[in-house]
């Protein structure tokens, strides 16, 4: 992981209790590979998963839930290891990334790591309610599902809103200069 990455996530990396929960997966080659793929906007899949993992860990800890499973599964929930933007056009709806990637992430997570039942449930069901029949079994599964939606939205909408605000300000300045 690059120096820039380490600087960006310094607070998280220095959280010893969090790192103890994820130490066996955080620096693994499989998890590092997620940095090669864009998830939302300019955010890589690794950055997205770290954000989901850390926020879920903090909330789970506050709520006295299984924060270790939340942290680990949050980090692995999108371990699908492909560029989902390159999906072939014309695939039937059930083949779309949003519906299929949790299973691929779970397959990869099982391949590289030892998971408990709760972590498996979290990874497999994190796209609920999109995946209607995959209803989360644990509170931690619901938590990661909600944190994932929040994080995805902030990674997608906030940068667009900032750009829109910048363009709006530019327009106002140009308009104001006409009437000087």
Map each language-model feature to its residues.
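Metal-dependent phosphohydrolase cores
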Residues: 1-180
């Amino acid at each position: 992981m690059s120096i820039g990455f380490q600087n960006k996530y310094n607070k998280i990396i220095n959280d010893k209790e969090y790192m103890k929960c994820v130490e066996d997966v955080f620096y693994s080659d499989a998890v590092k590979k997620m940095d090669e793929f864009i998830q939302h906007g300019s955010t890589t899949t690794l950055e997205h998963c770290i954000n989901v993992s850390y926020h879920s860990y903090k909330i789970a800890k506050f709520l006295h839930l299984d924060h270790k499973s939340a942290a680990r599964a949050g980090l692995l929930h999108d371990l699908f290891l492909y560029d989902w933007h390159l999906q072939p056009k014309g695939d039937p709806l059930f083949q779309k990334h949003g519906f299929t990637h949790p299973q691929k992430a779970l397959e990869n997570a099982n391949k590289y790591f030892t998971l408990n039942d709760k972590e498996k449930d979290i990874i497999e069901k994190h796209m609920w309610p999109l995946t209607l029949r995959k209803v989360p079994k644990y509170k931690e599964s619901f938590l990661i599902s909600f944190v994932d939606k929040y994080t995805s939205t902030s990674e997608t909408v906030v940068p667009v809103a900032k750009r829109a605000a910048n363009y709006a300000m530019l327009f106002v300045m140009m308009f104001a200069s006409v009437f000087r």
